[in-house]
């Protein structure tokens, strides 16, 4: 009988569909290793269950128990502890109903606390995967809620240091996060690095979309692409300044920003009031994955000043990438080999790099090919799935010995 796993994820199914990444839910069975994959989304607008197929089911717990709690602060605060116990109760029922073998939380804060509580009550193992440098993200944008508890970053850090050492396994997605996990008290023998995996087969096929026609772009324009959330932690303000400076040097480029987010109204206002930005930046909004992939392939350069999955796809598109030297970017962006890796906030350096790449198409193409080779070597789904299956097998053996 195949094992079963329960994920606890800070998301909603609707948001995943909007971002075009809902297809990744189906990758969680690791090529058929799991017979049942249950996903709990603990903080949603409404309570609902979504059956995707015989293997994959999603359960969303709505923050909707007390009427009018969104309008009144007192009712909202009253609902928090009730909601937490509601999540735990719902998760416990799912664990028993589907005979879950172990739980995986996808952050070391609320998701980790829920996994720890349910794991202990059900006497099954739990693991925590770490997907970002939350300290860095918090530094860049104080409004990021995933790394706060009741609005407090300090409380979140205390919870992180309490939860992580208690997990049966901690699975950061890269080396730098493994170092941080160890600093938070996780024993070295509990840490397993699980690189991001992406189904990259689409990058071997022909494009489905003509980007110039789709967005009504002058064919003579050289495209520079940004694909991601329009948020402070993605350095979107820097992209505007980059466009302004590059626009003072040359007129043959267009930066297409595909995505949405909190900074979108502010960016729109700046574009409306600045003729240079208006000429050289297009806000494309959220786009389907196939459009985003074809946009990357139509680009001369990808801007990934801060990126996760999007950096892998940018490299897989066989185009040079420009990134800041933060988080894990140095693993993919080899300076002057697969792109340009620049000091954080070095806007002048980014402008110089873009100008050089646009002027040197042969060298740029060679960098892009190296970037693609590296993406396939490190992050192709088959290889990363094998790593995760190995980690999961270890956890399952711990459950049997519990």
What are these regions (language model features)?
Residues 1-51, 400:
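N-terminal subdomain of nucleotide-sugar transferases
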Residues 6-8, 218-234, 239-243, 256:
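Conserved donor-binding/catalytic core segment of Leloir-type glycosyltransferases
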Residues 25-32, 89-93, 113, 117-121, ...:
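Membrane-proximal helix-turn-helix segments that form the acceptor-binding/catalytic region
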Residues 43, 176, 197:
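Carbohydrate-associated surface elements
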Residues 168, 294-307, 319-320:
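Acidic donor-binding loop of glycosyltransferase active sites
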Residues 265-290:
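Nucleotide-activated donor-binding/catalytic signature segment of Leloir-type glycosyltransferases, i.e.
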Residues 320-323, 327-328, 333:
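Short hydrophobic beta-strand element within catalytic cores of glycosyltransferases
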């Amino acid at each position: 009988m195949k094992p079963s796993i329960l994920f606890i994820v800070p998301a909603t199914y609707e948001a995943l569909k909007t971002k075009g990444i809902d297809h990744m839910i189906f990758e969680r069975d690791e090529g058929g290793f799991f017979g049942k994959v249950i996903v709990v989304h603990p903080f949603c607008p409404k309570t609902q269950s979504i059956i995707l197929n015989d293997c994959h089911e999603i359960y969303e717990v709505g923050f909707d128990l007390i009427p009018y709690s969104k309008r009144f602060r007192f009712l909202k605060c009253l609902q928090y502890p009730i909601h937490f116990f509601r999540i735990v109760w719902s998760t416990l029922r799912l664990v028993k109903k589907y005979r879950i073998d172990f739980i995986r939380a996808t952050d070391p804060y609320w998701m980790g606390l829920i996994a720890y509580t349910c794991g202990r009550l059900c006497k099954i193992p739990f693991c925590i995967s770490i997907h970002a440098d939350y300290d860095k993200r918090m530094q860049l944008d104080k409004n990021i809620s995933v790394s706060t508890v009741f609005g407090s970053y300090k409380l979140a850090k205390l919870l992180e240091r309490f939860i992580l050492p208690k997990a049966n396994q901690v699975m950061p997605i890269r080396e730098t996060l493994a170092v941080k996990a160890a600093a938070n008290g996780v024993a070295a023998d509990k840490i397993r690095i699980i690189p991001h995996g992406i189904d990259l087969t689409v990058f071997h096929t022909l494009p489905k979309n003509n980007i110039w026609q789709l967005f009504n772009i002058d064919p003579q324009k050289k495209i520079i692409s940004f694909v991601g959330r329009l948020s402070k932690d993605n350095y979107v303000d820097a992209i505007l300044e980059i466009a302004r400076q590059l626009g003072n040097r040359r007129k043959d480029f267009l930066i297409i920003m595909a995505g949405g987010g909190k900074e979108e109204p502010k960016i729109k206002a700046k574009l409306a009031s600045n003729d240079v930005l208006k000429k050289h930046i297009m806000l494309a909004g959220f786009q389907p994955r196939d459009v985003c992939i074809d946009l990357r392939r139509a680009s001369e350069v990808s801007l990934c000043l801060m990126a996760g999955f999007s950096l892998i796809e940018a490299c897989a598109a066989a185009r040079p990438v420009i990134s800041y030297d933060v988080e894990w970017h140095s693993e993919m962006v080899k300076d002057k080999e697969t792109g340009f890796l620049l000091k954080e906030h070095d806007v002048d350096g980014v402008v110089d790099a873009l100008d050089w790449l646009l002027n040197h198409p042969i060298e740029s193409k060679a960098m892009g090919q190296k970037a693609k080779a590296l993406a396939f070597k490190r992050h192709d789904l088959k290889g990363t799935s094998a790593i995760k299956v190995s980690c999961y097998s270890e956890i399952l053996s711990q459950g049997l010995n519990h």
